[in-house]
């Protein structure tokens, strides 16, 4: 793991971290009990098993 040679100021740290952005999970259409909903892929199987409530 890279180790910084010098301490980084708080302003520089926050500036660097603020560049990172989270992306929305891609959604897939799922048909459960005749209703079509859009869910993230990791929740598809849980929805089919009835573990996740879909509106």
Swiss-Prot record:
UniProt biased composition (Basic residues): 1-19
Pfam families: Ribosomal_L32p (PF01783)
Any single Gene Ontology cellular-component annotation: large ribosomal subunit
Source domain of life: Bacteria
Region feature (Disordered): 1-21
Keyword vocabulary terms for this entry: Ribonucleoprotein, Ribosomal protein
Example of a GO MF term: structural constituent of ribosome
Keyword GTP-binding annotated: no
BP term (GO), one: translation
InterPro entries noted in UniProt: Ribosomal_bL32 (IPR002677), Ribosomal_zn-bd (IPR011332)
Family of the protein in this entry: Belongs to the bacterial ribosomal protein bL32 family.
Database matches in NCBIfam families: rpmF_bact (TIGR01031)
Cited HAMAP family: Ribosomal_bL32
Protein name listed in UniProt: Large ribosomal subunit protein bL32
Encoding gene per record: rpmF
């Amino acid at each position: 793991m890279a180790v910084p040679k010098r301490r980084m100021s708080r302003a520089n740290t926050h500036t660097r971290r603020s560049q990172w952005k989270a992306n929305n999970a891609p959604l897939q259409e799922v048909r459960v009990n005749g209703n079509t909903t859009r869910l993230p892929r990791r929740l598809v199987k849980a929805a089919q098993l009835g573990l996740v409530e879909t509106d």
